[in-house]
């Protein structure tokens, strides 16, 4: 049995408690408050899906070239610029075809 001074014993005790506390924190609480067990994995997934449905979170990988389009009822939809250009193109084609077919109706 070695004789440690009171300062060395308190430093040893403090370091031991600190290491044990840090390991416990990293194991249990470091994942945004979710525990590392099976139920918490499903709870985290449920919260992520709810945030996507409520449009509080964006689908990963789908954030480039986005613009905001607001519909009449106040719902905001996020779309790519390519989708918007395709919609404008399709609307112009439909209007042109309707105009051409209107010649035959007269």
Swiss-Prot record:
Knockout consequences: Increases frequency of mitochondrial genome loss. Partially altered shape of the mitochondrial network with condensed, fragmented mitochondria accumulating at the periphery of cells. 20-40% of mitochondria exhibit an increased inner membrane surface and stacks of lamellar cristae disconnected from the inner boundary membrane.
InterPro entries reported in the protein's UniProt record: Mic12 (IPR031463)
Parts of the chain on the Mitochondrial intermembrane side: 28-106
Summary of subunit composition and partner proteins: Component of the mitochondrial contact site and cristae organizing system (MICOS) complex, composed of at least MIC10, MIC12, MIC19, MIC26, MIC27 and MIC60. This complex was also known under the names MINOS or MitOS complex. Interacts with OM45 and POR1.
Mitochondrial matrix side: 1-10
Membrane-topology descriptor: Single-pass membrane protein
Keyword Magnesium: no
Note: Present with 2550 molecules/cell in log phase SD medium.
Protein name as annotated: MICOS complex subunit MIC12
Key words, A-Z: Membrane, Mitochondrion, Mitochondrion inner membrane, Transmembrane, Transmembrane helix
Intracellular or extracellular location(s): Mitochondrion inner membrane
Role this protein plays: Component of the MICOS complex, a large protein complex of the mitochondrial inner membrane that plays crucial roles in the maintenance of crista junctions, inner membrane architecture, and formation of contact sites to the outer membrane.
Major location (coarse): mitochondrion
Gene name of the record: MIC12
Record-linked Pfam families: AIM5
Membership in a protein family: Belongs to the MICOS complex subunit Mic12 family.
């Amino acid at each position: 049995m070695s004789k440690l001074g009171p300062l060395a014993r308190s430093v040893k005790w403090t370091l031991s408690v600190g290491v044990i506390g840090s390991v416990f924190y990293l194991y249990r609480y470091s994942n945004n408050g979710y525990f590392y067990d099976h139920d918490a994995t499903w709870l985290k997934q449920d919260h992520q899906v709810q945030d996507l449905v409520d449009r509080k979170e964006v689908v990963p990988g789908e954030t480039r070239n986005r613009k905001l389009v607001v519909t009449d009822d106040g719902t905001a939809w996020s779309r790519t610029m390519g989708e918007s250009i395709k919609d404008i193109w399709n609307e112009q084609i439909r209007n042109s075809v309707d105009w051409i077919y209107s010649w035959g109706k007269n």
